Amino acid sequence: MSAWIVAARRTAVVPRGGAFARLSIEDLGAPVVRAVLADSGVEAVDELVVSNALGAGGNPARRVALAAGLEVAGLTIDRQCAGGLDALRLAAALVESGAEAVLAGGVESYSRRPLRLATDPDGGAPVAYDEAPFTPWPDRDPGMAEAAARLADRLGMSRAAQEAFAVESHRKALAAVPAGIVELAGVARDAFPRRLTPAVAARAKGVAGSVTAATMAVAADGAAFCLVVGDKLAARFPRAMRIVAGATLGSDPLEPGLSAIAPMRAVLDRAGIGAGELERVELMEAFAVQAMATIEALGLDMGRVNPEGGGLAFGHPVGASGAMLAVRLFHGLRGGHGLAGIAGAGGVGAALLVQARDSTEPGRI
């Protein structure tokens, strides 16, 4: 039994405080879920798996399911940036164990995220925090921007090189015709891509070391979902994308920017596929240096990586970002193999290898 993605939709990605600022996670997620079901003609699913990193509990998947009119319990996962791809891997496992259809993806509202307070064991006033701890060791838990700056120093990647990468990401995003977007709050296009020039990038505010506001992804709101089904149901669809392999691995938490490399390499090795055989790669660009290091380490063809731009141009709706990669693969891959990869806080990375079935060959792979 194989697992297949047969429909995929997403919202636009909008920086926090923008057009989605008043929308809850169910406001973001439910319209996308309904659109996926409408596209597929599937009326009922066995489960809804939702990645969410900032919602502070309450089972967001159940809330999205109820808002979308689904009679499922809903399963929420939190693996931070890696969660969107993990949701798809869980959906594939459910299908391979007997489920007929599972919706999976992620939703994030940076704008509406709850405020978080750490209690004082000595009875003092609670202390607000914005970024959760990702390791049990305060001295080995660097901020993401700080870790990216250290990585750039170690690898000798200059600020100018990072800026050039960001400029190219925006250029590709502006030139692309996005597919699969569900219009929401009047927004039908990603809101952040702009005509970033080298001169403008050079004036960007420094964040940490050589990392600037131009070379790290902005915090954003958004949702993305895919419908995952088995062989029998997949045969009905002219376009389908088989989930070939997936992996989520832990690596050095001091260098989280490198954490996508091992799982991406693992799925390629498992399938016996070389990097040069990939038709398309969707790699999350949380930081320019992170994406550049991953591309170099795996020997990826730059012309096939993020051909419609990446996270530097779109933004980073944390729990939804991995699912966004899968949606872009679904709409952009016309044959052959595609790879999605994402690095995450705490040194966790995820990858998903897929193979597209050509629309002229229903039932074959």
Model-identified regions with their sequence ranges:
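Flexible glycine-/small-residue-enriched beta->alpha junction loops
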Residues: 92, 102-150
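Active-site-proximal alpha-helical scaffold in enzymes
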Residues: 79-108, 152-177, 226-233, 295, ...
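Condensing-enzyme catalytic core mediating Claisen C-C bond formation in acyl metabolism
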Residues: 1-26, 199-258, 262, 266, ...
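N-terminal extracellular/periplasmic Venus flytrap/periplasmic-binding protein-like
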Residues: 10-11, 30, 161-234, 297, ...
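Short, well-ordered amphipathic alpha-helical segments that serve as non-catalytic structural scaffolds
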Residues: 25-40, 60, 64, 87, ...
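Conserved catalytic cysteine-centered active-site region
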Residues: 23, 51-100, 139-144, 195-218, ...
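Active-site pocket-lining segment
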Residues: 244-313
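Conserved beta-ketoacyl condensing-enzyme motif
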Residues: 21-90, 95-101, 107-118, 181-189, ...
